[in-house]
Amino acid sequence: MTVSLSNLSNLSDLARKRVAVAAYYFVPGVVFASWASRIPDVKQMLHLSNGQLGTVLFAIPIGQLLMMAFSGILVSRFGSKKMLVLSELLYALVLFCIGSSTTVFHLILSLIAFGMMANLMNIATNTQACLVEKMYGRNIMSSFHGLWSLGGFSGGIIGAIFANTLLPIDVHFGTILALSILIVAVGFRFLINDAMAKAEEEDVPKFSFKTIDPILFLLGLMGFAGMFCEGTVYDWSSVYFSSVVKPDEAFIRAGYVAGMGAMTLGRFMADGFVTKYGPARVLKVCGGLILGGLWLAAALPYLIPAT
């Protein structure tokens, strides 16, 4: 009986850790979608042309690139738990700064900081997820990424509601900031202590370009192409709907919300599909679906096919 209670206690503790990490994936999904769903409003507020908006949107990847060299160092030095909490809080705070931008310069600075916090948060969150997955002893990573997409889907719907009620962007983003602080504060104590995890780590071989299989560069190129398509949906779907598809105001964000909903389903089903059909076949089918979806949206710029 004692053993059974002990096992139950361990299982319950592990489940709490998984839920906490899942919540830390969900929050940035909501935060990012809040920004992405209001891009047309920010564009209109600052009187930006499509060309100017495209230039401004480069600020996020610039911030990610600037932080890339430091994120791993910070997580290793201070632990993923501390860096995750810090980056998620700052990520939501920067979102509020984006909504409060009154000049293009202010917006660009905010978006650079947004990208920097996103990169640090990605490293810290995935580190926590890897630790939980190791404890479970089976592949659960896609479910965490699915929670990010679910957050994006939810954030897109929330953004559409705020936009359709004509509430100011700073009120919308301020509400998301408050909710983010609440969730981060509740989940903090259930995150994994890195010091405890590091004590169990084995020696890891040092990185060397000589040991890299050339096929990894091809996979990296494929990943880049996938992220390029993904970024197009994130940054331009709402603008495309508002300027080309031109549906009723209530449906301007329909494309973004539909894309995030489909991504959520795909990520939750990914582990099962890969196990059943193999990664190569799934990759080919997904590539074809991406190509077909983008072509359909561009060739038939109407509400139903574009969505």
Task: Provide a role label for each language-model segment.
Residues 67-80, 163, 266-279:
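Helix-to-loop junctions at the C-terminal end of transmembrane segments
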Residues 111-147:
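Cytoplasmic helix-loop-helix junction between adjacent transmembrane helices
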Residues 33, 60-69, 152-153, 260-268:
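Residue-level signature of mid-helix packing/kink "hotspots" within the transmembrane helices
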Residues 66-105:
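Conserved MFS/SLC helix-loop-helix module at the cytosolic interface between two early adjacent transmembrane helices
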Residues 106, 143-192:
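Helix-loop-helix hairpin linking two adjacent transmembrane segments in secondary transporters
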Residues 82-96, 281-296:
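Structural signature of the two symmetry-related core transmembrane helices
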Residues 37-51, 235-251:
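Short amphipathic helix-loop junctions that connect adjacent transmembrane helices
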Residues 47, 79, 100-105, 246, ...:
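Helix-breaking motifs and short loop linkers at transmembrane-helix boundaries and internal kinks
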